[in-house]
């Protein structure tokens, strides 16, 4: 699965959840297929105000060229710095590091200090934006309408039936974070973490072509298995949130199977508008993992 550079793929026609975070990217059976689809759907769209006018380089150009002398940074905070990360996941991530090194890349451990605070920051920023964006779905102007005896009852009925439990939970979190007396204490601090994270990434990308981490601290869980445990689902976002907060591209590549028979993913992160190198490294990782 691919998360492109923020603004690299048009979001026109998309339901907005968190406007500064929402992105569209492909799922595919191979890195090459993902790159091809990305080339097709990417590019400037005047109907999307966040769309980047800069033309991206073809994402398939570097496929098959190897990764000799590319510099890869392994984010230590997302390896051993996560509470509860699976030993199996760490082992597979270390195997991925070895595979890239054997393929000619220069692989080194790096530090991304702000990554330790990203999970908390994300679950303040995203729900806050969702609370604002989804307030328009009142049954009058957009979307589903459920009748009531008066306007207030119609609004309540519409939002009660139109939003699932997780959406309601995030709206409540966001409304609380934006409420008087809590904005500076929570939302304002989350934005500071976001700025600090962007600075951390900028410093790393001065010296490294891409970064590497696990995709998740555990193997994939089955669909619906954790629905009643939202905190577990939130915590499993810890590795993928950093690139999303700053709008940088990232790709998750399957790299082995855990003892429970479920897949383990390795994530490659890249500087904005530099997906071609990201795909180049991901292809090497894909070949090593098959």
Question: What is each PLM-predicted segment?
Answer:
Residues 80, 90-93, 97, 107, ...:
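N-terminal beta1-alpha1 cap of cysteine-dependent amidohydrolase-like domains
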Residues 106-111, 251:
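General small-molecule cofactor/ligand-binding pocket signal
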Residues 121-127, 227-229, 266-268:
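Short low-complexity, flexible loop/linker segments enriched in glycine and/or proline
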Residues 84-89, 121, 225-227:
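Short, solvent-exposed loop/turn segments at secondary-structure boundaries
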């Amino acid at each position: 699965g691919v998360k492109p550079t923020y603004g690299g793929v048009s979001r026109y026609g998309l339901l907005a959840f968190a406007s500064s975070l929402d992105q569209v990217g492909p799922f595919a059976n191979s890195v090459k297929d993902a790159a091809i689809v990305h080339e097709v759907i990417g590019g400037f769209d005047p109907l999307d105000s966040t769309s980047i006018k800069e033309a991206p380089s073809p994402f398939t150009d570097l496929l098959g060229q190897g990764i000799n002398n590319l510099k890869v940074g392994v984010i230590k905070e997302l390896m051993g710095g996560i509470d509860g990360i699976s030993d199996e996941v760490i082992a597979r991530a270390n195997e991925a590091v070895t595979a890239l090194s054997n393929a000619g890349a220069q692989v080194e451990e790096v530090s991304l200090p702000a990554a330790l605070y990203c999970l908390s920051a994300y679950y303040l920023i995203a729900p806050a934006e969702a609370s604002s964006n989804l307030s328009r779905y009142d049954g009058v102007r957009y979307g589903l309408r459920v009748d009531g005896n008066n306007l207030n009852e119609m609004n309540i009925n519409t939002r009660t039936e139109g939003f699932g439990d997780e959406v309601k939970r995030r709206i409540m979190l966001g409304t609380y974070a934006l409420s008087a007396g809590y904005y500076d204490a929570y939302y304002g601090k989350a934005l500071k973490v976001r700025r600090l994270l962007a600075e951390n990434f900028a410093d790393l990308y001065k010296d490294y072509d891409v970064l590497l981490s696990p995709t998740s601290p555990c193997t994939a869980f089955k669909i619906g298995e954790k629905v009643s445990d939202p905190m577990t689902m939130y915590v499993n976002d810890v590795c993928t949130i950093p690139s999303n907060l700053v709008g940088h591209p990232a790709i998750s590549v399957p790299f082995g199977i855990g003892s429970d028979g479920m897949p383990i993913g390795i994530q490659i992160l890249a500087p904005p508008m530099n997906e071609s190198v990201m795909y180049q490294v991901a292809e090497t990782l894909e070949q090593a993992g098959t």
